[in-house]
Amino acid sequence: MARNLPGFSRARWAGLAGGALVCGMLVACGGTEVDAQHSPPYPLAEFTQQTLDWQACAPERIGQDQEALLAALPDRTRCALLRVPLDYDHPAEGVLQIELLRVAAAQPQSRLGAIVFNPGGPGEDGLASALVHGMQWALASPEDVSGTQLREMSQRFDVIGFSPRGTGANHPLICDVPGTFEDQDSLTFDRSAENLQRAQRNAQRMARACLDNPLSAHIHTEATARDMDLLRAVLGDAQLNYIGYSYGTWLGSWYARLFPQRVGRMLLDSSLDVTQRLDDQFMLQDMANQRILDEIMLPFAERHRDTLALGSASELRAALLALPSSLKEALFDDMDFMDSSLLERAVLRMSAALGLDALMRSHPDADNDALLALVDSHLFAPVPRVNVAVARLARELIEALAGDENQAVKADWIETDAQGALRLLPEFTVNMAVRCNDTGTAGDAAYWLGVSNDQVARYPMVGGDTASKPCVYWPVSSRTIPPLSTIAGLPILMLQSRYDGATPVESAQATLAALPGARMILVENEYQHGLFPYGTECVDTQVANYFLQGTLPPRNSSCAGKALAGKAGA
């Protein structure tokens, strides 16, 4: 989830727009319904009776960083296209194609079914999820119990990833922007009326761009959940086994509400609050990220004051807040609050920012080139190896300052076509469409500006982004989500880290309270977002036992988190 756009996941694959949707609309649908009790009465036989044509996967669709994984399991990895209705309420209006990737069970004779993955977002392309997890499981160490169990999961389950509708290469939701975006600075550190107004106008422009694309109306969680049920039916499985991370927990919950009798083993990893609106609850990220800063990052720096010389946690906090706005923006807008293995780097970047501030104050006329030269002779930390690491991060901050990026334009979710027109890519557009279409949002622009003001006051290093709310300008009726009572007794397993910055523990606890049949494993002293497989026996053995034998842990159980970091600068 990107720092400047709370709740927005950062997918790495974006397809090409074109006539694919128009061509798909020429295909009519017919047949019989798949589930009279939980689905509207429309014909789906054409979809449920299709045969998947599994072929070798195209490496360019998986991503260059995943090609090695593709080569590691060549005989078991195949890709296919699943045909689904554009609109489940009117299936004759058109067809979409959903990309699939399967890592087949190594021992098909003892196959227990398929496990479908969703990595989150919304807007994350999940095609490679199966490849990543299939590789992790297949190559887990046989020297310990949890590794042996992960290998057994690889042997007995097909692992399936898919590109949710709106993502992938076949029918991407790409929205053409009329005009340009206004220059927008950080909503945390520039609270001027002009900047806030620019942010609101940009949010309105984003919403209007996608409302002009007819595909947007069909991008929502209910449709994706029904796509997953078609996948289950085409695979020939009586029930859906599922692992969802972050937004994937919301998707899994919606699927379960639609098809409670179809739920097999379901793991909700890093949970949203399924009792609240989707779009409204992302404001909790500000609270959770500030908590990571105050309760984990700053105390870590204090514990290593001998190597970092940053003083006490309170002294460091005050020094960071006193930084000039431009430097605070460069520091905190690229702070990772979802990967606790990067704790050391986060604290070293704080040291770099403070050292750079000292250089800028002592050399007020220095340009970026001069600052880069000054960094080479500046003592950032008393330990030589730490000083080298901090100096490198100071150079990165100087580059960020030189970029002075418009916060409304991010290179990974926007592109410029040959004529210079802006286009919003699926990483952003699917996120926006799902959040706006699913359950709408509370209040109007003035309401969210008030929330933003409150968040900045409470969380001065990370709060305020709720001033920019595209869903306020999205006049589309939200979906009707089935009641939670339909799944209250389902034996769903949840996994959560205590300090999760993207989906706070409070959200998971609210979901657990609403699901009496669910069980939750809480990983302590940890802010990793997305845990399984975690790499400890306490976590992985309990999850594997659930999928392999259906064994559930107690209602509330806990596991020790992995050590957050070693010696600073090591």
Predicted regions and their residues:
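Bacterial signal peptide processing site
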Residues: G30-E33
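Intrinsically disordered, low-complexity serine/threonine-rich segments
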Residues: A11-R12, L26, F117, P426
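Bacterial N-terminal signal peptides
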Residues: A17-L26
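N-terminal secretory signal peptides that target proteins for export/translocation
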Residues: M1-A11
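Gly/Pro-rich cap/lid or specificity-loop segments adjacent to the active site
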Residues: D35-A353, F428-A570
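Alpha/beta-hydrolase-fold enzymes
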Residues: A301-L425
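General helical structural elements
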Residues: G7, A14-L16, A106
